[in-house]
UniProtKB/Swiss-Prot annotation:
One Pfam family it belongs to: CRCB
Name of this chain's protein: Fluoride-specific ion channel FluC 1
Sorted UniProt keywords: Cell membrane, Ion channel, Ion transport, Membrane, Metal-binding, Sodium, Transmembrane, Transmembrane helix, Transport
Role: Fluoride-specific ion channel. Important for reducing fluoride concentration in the cell, thus reducing its toxicity.
One GO term (biological process): cellular detoxification of fluoride
Segments traversing the membrane: 4-24, 37-57, 67-87, 98-118
Residues that coordinate or bind Na(+): G77, T80
Gene Ontology annotations for the cellular component aspect, listed alphabetically: plasma membrane
Length: 137
């Protein structure tokens, strides 16, 4: 049965990477500036989703742990991209876009922490609400 986790992570990873790719293309259709908005928005969304998933969905026990791992490690792990963030930052620095690079790094780190905090807070709130409504885990 442990082979199922590899399949779940693999399939979810493919879906996460494709989602990032197509969402990035869509954002680039409307955003034609130096600032790497697509990667920032995708990474911030991933921070929120992973925190919410691990704080709420995983604790409800409504999905098998292999599915939770598939979503977290596979989908969200391949949807977000630290390597693209790093390369884009170096490219900005190499093109002497110091201000944009600083803004990008700041928004990525602080925004990631804020979005993770919001995902955690929402997950915790929903979990407590779920428990107080009489549905116990």
């Amino acid at each position: 049965m442990r082979k199922l986790i590899y399949i779940m992570v693999g399939i979810a990873g493919i879906l996460g990477a494709l989602s990032r790719y197509y969402l990035g293309l869509t954002i680039h259709e409307f955003w034609h500036h130096t600032f790497p908005l697509a990667t920032l928005l995708i990474n911030l969304a991933g921070c929120f989703l992973l925190a919410w998933l691990t704080t709420y969905i995983a604790k409800l026990n409504i999905l098998p742990s292999d599915v939770i791992t598939g979503i977290g490690t596979g989908f969200i792990g391949s949807f977000t991209t630290f390597s693209t963030f790093s390369v884009e930052t170096i490219q900005l620095i190499n093109h002497f876009e110091w201000g944009i690079a600083f803004l990008y790094v700041s928004c990525s780190i602080l925004g990631g922490l804020i979005m993770s905090g919001l995902g955690y807070t929402l997950g915790d709130f929903l979990l407590k609400k779920h428990l107080t409504e009489g549905d116990h885990l």
